[in-house]
């Protein structure tokens, strides 16, 4: 096999690849052995028809396509290695005429990253915002704890107020017709939560237990159900229960109930410490992000569409994982939001292009600075992962695949590269 670059234009390269006649003959024999059981010729048992007889009956080219499929992957990969080419997308092949006993020639057009340089990445000026914890931040955390530990108390002597939880039955109508999905019994709803269609919850304020009321709403134009979008509807609602939130007292007893501390003062001190740690991490992470963005913004680089699409694919996988963690799927998300995959891809595109550029710039800097992931780096990362996932180190290692180790090393290199940039940046 031999290969050469025929043409190079912008970020497209056309390769000429030649597979020797002897090598192709071996592939033809493999194709014949794979297919011979499918030929039925009188006088021969199935799978015993000689190759020459098959070629005489069906033509010498009968095995060419399968033989080409056999030699193509290795020939293409060999050409990439020989010419030191790293494609960013699938190749486009063009096959010429194949003649028996002759070398086989074909071309492969591949996309590669456009050439670009990264300069001035050390000493770049970057803003660093310091986030500090205030007393009101601690109080907000305490308020969240009280909300989480509130009790819902049944109310019978007053009508519905904002913030109450109500238990209702409802039936929805458009005109005289009841619509699908518009009926429920013993449905819990917090007034002011905006869970329902705009205008629905507010009309329940003032209703009492046992009341039957009619709630008139207009579905939003962008509502996920096209049959209901923009239409006026009436809901017949029956109020069964009214409950109000009772917050616990903020005292030492509360601290004992919700934490390992004996006093409210100790709980507040712990919350303050955690908030300070979080603020410090936020300060550092935002600073590192600013450094990456500032360095990448200096680089003139048009990101190929194939790279952007690949980044969008990765972002979609991450989003799908997040949805599954919340008990949803992409399909249910599309239905709920009235969108399609192409809409979501469009929303992600700008961010995907930004991320792709930053990653390419970081990769180039790591090459220039000869940054590597040492055995010590990998060992420390594995120990950190074992602690995070609460696994024994040996068990964690046994579950890791080769590609997992590759990802770990790549992550270490990226982190060390950002460390280098952050340490050498000037805080403005």
Curated annotation (Swiss-Prot):
Transmembrane domains' residue ranges: none
Chief subcellular location: cytoplasm
Single Gene Ontology BP annotation: protein transport
Catalysis: reaction(s): [protein]-peptidylproline (omega=180) = [protein]-peptidylproline (omega=0)
NCBIfam families the record matches: tig (TIGR00115)
Known function: Involved in protein export. Acts as a chaperone by maintaining the newly synthesized protein in an open conformation. Functions as a peptidyl-prolyl cis-trans isomerase.
Domain remarks: Consists of 3 domains; the N-terminus binds the ribosome, the middle domain has PPIase activity, while the C-terminus has intrinsic chaperone activity on its own.
Protein name: Trigger factor
Organism expressing this protein natively: Alkaliphilus metalliredigens (strain QYMF)
């Amino acid at each position: 096999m031999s290969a050469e670059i025929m043409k190079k234009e912008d970020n497209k390269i056309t390769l000429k690849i030649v597979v020797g006649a002897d090598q192709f003959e071996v592939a033809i024999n493999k194709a014949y052995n794979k297919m011979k059981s499918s030929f039925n010729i009188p006088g021969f048992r199935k799978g015993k028809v000689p190759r020459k007889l098959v070629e005489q009956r069906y033509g010498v080219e009968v095995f060419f396509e399968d033989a080409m499929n056999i030699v193509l992957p290795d020939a293409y990969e060999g050409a990439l290695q020989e010419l030191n080419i790293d494609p960013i997308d699938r190749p486009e092949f063009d096959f010429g005429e194949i003649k028996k006993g002759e070398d086989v020639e074909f071309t492969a057009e591949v996309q590669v990253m456009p050439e670009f340089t990264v300069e001035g990445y050390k000493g770049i000026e970057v803003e660093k915002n310091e986030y500090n914890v205030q007393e009101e931040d601690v109080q907000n955390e305490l308020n969240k704890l009280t909300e989480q530990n509130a009790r819902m108390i049944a109310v019978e002597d007053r009508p519905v107020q904002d913030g109450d939880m109500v238990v209702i039955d409802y039936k929805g109508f458009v005109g005289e017709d009841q619509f699908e999905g518009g009926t429920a019994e013993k449905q819990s709803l917090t007034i002011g939560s905006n869970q329902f269609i705009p205008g629905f919850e507010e009309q329940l304020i003032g209703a009492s237990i046992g009341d039957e009321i009619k709630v008139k709403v207009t579905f939003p134009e962008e509502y996920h159900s096209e049959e209901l979008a923009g239409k006026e509807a009436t809901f017949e609602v029956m109020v069964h229960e009214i409950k109000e939130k009772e917050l616990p007292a903020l005292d030492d007893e509360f601290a004992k109930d919700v934490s390992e501390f004996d006093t409210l003062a100790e709980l507040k001190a712990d919350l303050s410490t955690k908030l300070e740690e979080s603020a410090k991490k936020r300060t550092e992470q935002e600073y590192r992000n600013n450094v990456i963005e500032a360095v990448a913004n200096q680089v003139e680089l048009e990101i190929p569409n194939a790279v952007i699409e690949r980044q969008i694919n990765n972002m979609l996988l991450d989003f799908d994982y997040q949805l599954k963690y919340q008990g949803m799927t992409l399909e249910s998300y599309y239905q709920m939001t009235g969108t399609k995959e192409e809409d979501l891809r469009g929303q992600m595109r700008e961010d995907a292009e930004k991320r792709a550029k930053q990653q390419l710039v970081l990769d180039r800097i790591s090459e220039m600075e000869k940054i590597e992931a040492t055995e010590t780096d990998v060992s420390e990362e594995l120990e950190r992962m074992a602690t995070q996932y609460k696994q024994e180190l040996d068990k964690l290692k046994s579950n890791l695949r080769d590609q997992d180790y590759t990802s770990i090393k790549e992550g270490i290199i990226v982190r060390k590269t950002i460390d280098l940039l952050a340490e050498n940046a000037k805080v403005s």
